């Protein structure tokens, strides 16, 4: 898998599917940032998302440009950017729409703890 502590840019549906599958097999939380190059709030939140990735190496952070990989955005019904989709065991468990750095940070911390606890108890 890619480097821990980094945001992984997705450029193909196959990349996304592979990383989600690997993350699910490892019992990891996956956070997907649906973004667009022309979106000012997306540019605002990008460095914060990157810092969250560095601070939460047990979580997989993916970035999907909705104009580049439309199929993934359509699959998840994304129609506003940024949208953050939280996945666990191939299921969406939470969604945040908008560049709310406090809400994003709190939810990543909460769900990362929960994912780590469930991975430990099932090991």
What is the predicted function of each stretch?
Residues 15, 44, 103-106:
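Acidic, Ser/Thr-rich intrinsically disordered and amphipathic helical segments
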Residues 79-122:
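Non-catalytic, surface beta->alpha helical segment in thiol-disulfide oxidoreductase systems
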Residues 10-12, 34, 45-71, 78:
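Thiol-based oxidoreductase modules, predominantly thioredoxin-like and allied folds used
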Residues 15, 36-37, 68, 89-91, ...:
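Conserved beta-strand elements of beta-rich interaction domains across eukaryotes
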Residues 1-8, 123:
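N-terminal targeting signals for export/organelle localization
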Residues 39-42:
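Short cysteine clusters
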Residues 9-29, 70:
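A short beta-strand-turn-helix
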Residues 2-5, 30, 52, 58-62, ...:
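Chalcogenol-based redox active-site neighborhoods
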């Amino acid at each position: 898998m890619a480097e821990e502590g980094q945001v992984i840019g997705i450029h193909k549906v196959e990349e996304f599917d592979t990383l989600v599958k690997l993350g699910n097999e490892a019992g990891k939380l996956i956070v997907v940032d649906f973004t667009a190059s022309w979106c000012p709030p997306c540019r605002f939140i990008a460095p914060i998302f990157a810092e969250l990735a560095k601070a939460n190496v047990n979580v997989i952070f993916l970035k999907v440009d909705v104009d580049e990989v439309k199929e993934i955005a359509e699959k998840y019904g994304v129609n506003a950017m940024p949208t953050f989709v939280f996945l666990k065991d191939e299921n969406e468990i939470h969604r945040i729409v908008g560049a709310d750095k406090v809400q994003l940070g709190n939810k990543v911390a909460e769900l990362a703890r929960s994912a780590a606890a469930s991975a430990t108890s099932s090991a």
